[in-house]
């Protein structure tokens, strides 16, 4: 591999880092709170019936979770949901 290719790769990776680094530090991604709380409810792939809570953008709403899969916008109690997702 020639020196020109190595320098091109280093330059590309440097630019990529400079462009993406501020996004990684933004409030939307810092602790995952906003991203998690913006996800839709997802009952998962199984057919169990567990009462769980998800944040719908305004408040926490009860839904039935199937027991496997789904996403991180799923909480065991309304209180846990509000503590994670409600804006202070």
From Swiss-Prot:
Functional summary from the UniProt entry: Serine protease inhibitor that inhibits trypsin at a molar ratio of 1:1.
Listed PROSITE patterns: BPTI_KUNITZ_2
Limits of the BPTI/Kunitz inhibitor domain: 37-85
UniProt keyword Transferase, yes or no: no
Cited InterPro entries: Kunitz_BPTI, Kunitz_BPTI_sf
Name of a matching Pfam family: Kunitz_BPTI
UniProt feature coiled coil, ranges: none
SUPFAM superfamilies per UniProt: BPTI-like
Protein family (similarity comment): Belongs to the venom Kunitz-type family. 01 (intermediate) subfamily.
Cell location: Secreted
Domain of life of the native organism: Eukaryota
Organs and tissues of expression: Expressed by the venom gland.
Organism: Cyriopagopus hainanus
Positions of the propeptide removed during maturation: 28-33
Marked site (Reactive bond for trypsin) residue numbers: 47-48
Biological process annotations from GO: envenomation resulting in negative regulation of voltage-gated potassium channel activity in another organism
Gene Ontology cellular component terms for the protein in this record: extracellular region
Main location: secreted
UniProt-recorded name of the protein: Kunitz-type U15-theraphotoxin-Hhn1q
